């Protein structure tokens, strides 16, 4: 069952993937192994496909390092729940096919290590007997996810979903 990895407010792209581990520094095939190297050194070894990241306010602020969310995607992260997002980080998540949900209530309710199920289409998150309703992703994003990401969709169809 997917687990929650909970972080605090103001987690920036350098926290997610420190610059010294950028693809051009350590190699395109290894950079994701350093996700959260300074905050949670065990993260890259222990995260499993489908696990969910939970952030507080202003998730992903800082420089526009697309390789930070790319590292998360390579590790199997499919969704993030935050109180709020930095705009560029939010857009990079959408482009890469990681679903960004936003909910103060759910962030406050979840704890690090919780086991949860998340239906990406409906936005329903289940923890034991509890159910939380997140705003479901827009139809264009769900369509893009069928191909892997918004970028993958564009490469295959030569247009964006809904055009």
From Swiss-Prot:
One of its GO terms (biological process) is L-leucine biosynthetic process. It comes from the Bacteria. InterPro entries: Aconitase/3IPM_dehydase_swvl (IPR015928), AconitaseA/IPMdHydase_ssu_swvl (IPR000573), IPMI_Swivel (IPR033940), LeuD (IPR050075), LeuD_type2/HacB/DmdB (IPR011827). Keywords: Amino-acid biosynthesis, Lyase, Lysine biosynthesis. Optimum pH is 8.0. Pathway: Amino-acid biosynthesis; L-lysine biosynthesis via AAA pathway; L-alpha-aminoadipate from 2-oxoglutarate: step 3/5. One of its GO terms (molecular function) is 3-isopropylmalate dehydratase activity. Is not inhibited by lysine. Belongs to the LeuD family. Catalyzes the reversible hydration of cis-homoaconitate ((Z)-but-1-ene-1,2,4-tricarboxylate) to homoisocitrate ((1R,2S)-1-hydroxybutane-1,2,4-tricarboxylate). Can catalyze neither the dehydration of (R)-homocitrate ((2R)-2-hydroxybutane-1,2,4-tricarboxylate) into cis-homoaconitate in vitro, nor the reverse reaction. Is not active toward (S)-homocitrate, cis-aconitate or citrate as substrate. This is Homoaconitase small subunit.
